């Protein structure tokens, strides 16, 4: 279970908080759909849960974030990703390595997996998103949509209890959107918790809860 309690966020120089007294709970297999206009705080909320705020982006932040009885707040970002996977809206912020295979294996190197287990996860993730023919490709040569799928495959391979998704289908169309929807359905059926900012109502139809941050 994820418990988010009494979150408050205000950026330096702003007189009004982005949100305050924000509270919700999610059980295993639930998806929270974040809605509202641009700038209402959807990405900010994901950044708070991931630890980017306040560890990398400084802001006045308080509140409790509890995942399966574990307090996430004191956990450094590099350790927090053992418990959550985060797909940011701009894939270039998450792609660092010269080959797709290395990009996917990076998140698993400190997970205590055998080489065989790592390879199995990577193969499954690339097949889920149609990237199996791109193992040796330089990520910089991928299209924007392919980069987006690469980051989603990266998240899938992590196999964490919690997934944070920021516009997962932007720059995607047709078959690629269907792959993402199928993946989300599989996550939920396996008891994962998902928080998603997304404009596509077809994906929003998977939500068990909706939080409109624009209200």
Predicted regions and their residues:
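The feature captures the beta-strand-to-loop junction immediately N-terminal to the Walker
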Residues: 35-37
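ABC ATPase NBD Q-loop/coupling interface
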Residues: 51, 64-79
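Conserved ABC ATPase "signature" region
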Residues: 116-134
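Hydrophobic anchor residue at the start of the ABC signature
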Residues: 152-153
């Amino acid at each position: 279970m994820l418990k988010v309690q009494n979150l408050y966020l205000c950026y330096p120089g702003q007189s009004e908080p982005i949100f305050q007294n924000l509270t919700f709970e999610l059980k295993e297999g639930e998806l929270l759909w974040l809605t509202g206009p641009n700038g209402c705080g959807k990405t900010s909320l994901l950044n708070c849960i991931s630890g980017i705020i306040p560890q990398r982006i400084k802001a006045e932040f308080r509140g409790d974030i509890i995942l399966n009885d574990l307090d996430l707040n004191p956990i450094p970002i590099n350790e927090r990703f053992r418990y959550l996977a985060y797909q940011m809206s701009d894939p270039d912020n998450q792609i660092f390595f010269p080959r797709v295979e290395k990009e996917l294996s990076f998140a698993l190197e400190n997970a205590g997996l055998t080489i065989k287990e790592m390879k199995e996860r990577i193969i499954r993730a690339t097949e889920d998103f149609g990237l199996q023919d791109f193992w040796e490709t330089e990520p910089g040569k991928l299209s924007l949509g392919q980069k987006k799928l690469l980051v989603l495959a990266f998240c899938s391979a992590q196999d964490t209890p919690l997934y944070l998704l920021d516009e997962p289908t932007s720059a995607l169309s047709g078959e690629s959107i269907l792959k993402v929807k199928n993946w989300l359905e599989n996550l939920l059926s396996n008891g994962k918790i998902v928080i998603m900012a997304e404009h596509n109502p077809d994906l929003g139809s998977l939500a068990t809860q909706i939080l409109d941050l624009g209200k």
